[in-house]
């Protein structure tokens, strides 16, 4: 059997780390077993689906390195769904309903007030043909529900959570075709999964009830049921992550926070598993590590600091030749290999390099302790002559110690403030050659 997985986002908002984790896990599973990965755009919601969100989904997945063997829109397949609709009607698994949303809301409130779960009463099954004609004449529009078989339990062996059981009597018959004739994604999804021979459906645990319903849809259409797995959800400190909550979307991580794609991939592929979350440089490494059985049943708490730490580890170990084109893209084409090696240990994101470029070549040095003026003047006079190298710092410091007897913070902090304007950063021994001898002296003497 060829492994075929799919990712089926709705273009009604931006991708966030929760649904991208689903995409990544499905992609990794397909790659692990030399299978195929399909991107399906669930755009059946005509009112909320937007072209710009579809384009953003493509951009985000490509940025992460997640590619697909084929892709399609559900909206272009509505005609293909008609045959399944007629089959389910003729077999008695789809039935006509005429209640308005207001009528259904009244029924729901009545059930809750009486202490019953809000499960559809199936009153529409009692309608005669004449009553249906009368309702249509009065302006009521037909929609269709899928008839759940409530006489048998729904059971499957979940790839992540183990055996899951559902009592069909606790599930309301879902509306699958709206009044305007549009088929809702729940049934469309099953029809597509059958036609595209999806072998494994892996998605978030918030879809477990949908899965129970869709198992019966597969059976009603006479199709084999794919293997099913449900990932635990990613949560923030304040609760569930959503595409409508800022700070978790992929475009925010990329465009505002400046995170590397492999930092996102590492965090999402390894968090909540028995593997350590580490900074791997390639998706191929994650494919090797991937094991669906290693995923925990417990929810994951998203920590942005952990993502930034992974990002830092990646940058620290990135070679200059690999990053040079990216530096040009962010407006720093003149960054040399020496500069990159000097500052990369102090970068949390690639954009941080702009800070060090500013410090070395376009400084605004306003931090200065007046009591250190004489010390800095003396230090300027002891600076080695000629072109500064990585070894110049050690020679310079030894000369300063001999002349002033200053050591430790009393020696280093005035020099760092005078040369960079801040109290932290790359080792000064690496910054000196970048700043250059004349500029070093000028900064030391600027308040004389």
Curated annotation (Swiss-Prot):
The keyword Oxidoreductase does not apply. ATP binds at residue 243. One of its GO terms (molecular function) is tRNA binding. It catalyses: tRNA(Glu) + L-glutamate + ATP = L-glutamyl-tRNA(Glu) + AMP + diphosphate. Keywords: Aminoacyl-tRNA synthetase, ATP-binding, Cytoplasm, Ligase, Nucleotide-binding, Protein biosynthesis. One of its GO terms (biological process) is glutamyl-tRNA aminoacylation. A motif ('HIGH' region) lies at residues 9-19. Its EC number is 6.1.1.17. It holds the Pfam family tRNA-synt_1c. One of its GO terms (cellular component) is cytoplasm. A motif ('KMSKS' region) lies at residues 240-244. It is an enzyme of class 6 (ligase). Its main location: cytoplasm. It is found in: Cytoplasm. Monomer. Catalyzes the attachment of glutamate to tRNA(Glu) in a two-step reaction: glutamate is first activated by ATP to form Glu-AMP and then transferred to the acceptor end of tRNA(Glu). Belongs to the class-I aminoacyl-tRNA synthetase family. Glutamate--tRNA ligase type 1 subfamily. This is Glutamate--tRNA ligase 2. The gene is gltX2.
